[in-house]
């Protein structure tokens, strides 16, 4: 897979989280087999932790989000990966 795009339930610190272990394990397999790795999350997912942590932000190429993300939150998470 050249590029993978995964939706997530929460991003907290360097942790990428989802609602359940089965979904998280499947998403991790997809990301681990992609050359370029992206997650997609609207601004409400930042500083939010869901049930199962399945990936780390610093292992991703970027997080794709909406224009409503605050500059402070964007700056915080850009220390881990690109925030687009």
Model-inferred region functions:
Residues 1-84:
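Conserved phosphate- and dinucleotide-binding cores of soluble alpha/beta proteins
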């Amino acid at each position: 897979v050249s590029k993978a795009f995964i939706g997530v339930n929460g991003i907290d610190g360097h942790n990428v989280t989802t609602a359940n272990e089965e979904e998280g394990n499947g998403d991790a397999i997809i990301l681990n087999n992609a050359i370029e790795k992206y997650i997609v999350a609207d601004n409400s997912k930042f500083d939010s932790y869901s049930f199962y942590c399945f990936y780390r932000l610093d292992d991703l190429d970027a997080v794709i989000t909406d224009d409503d993300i605050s500059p402070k939150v964007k700056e915080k998470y850009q220390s881990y990966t690109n925030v687009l």
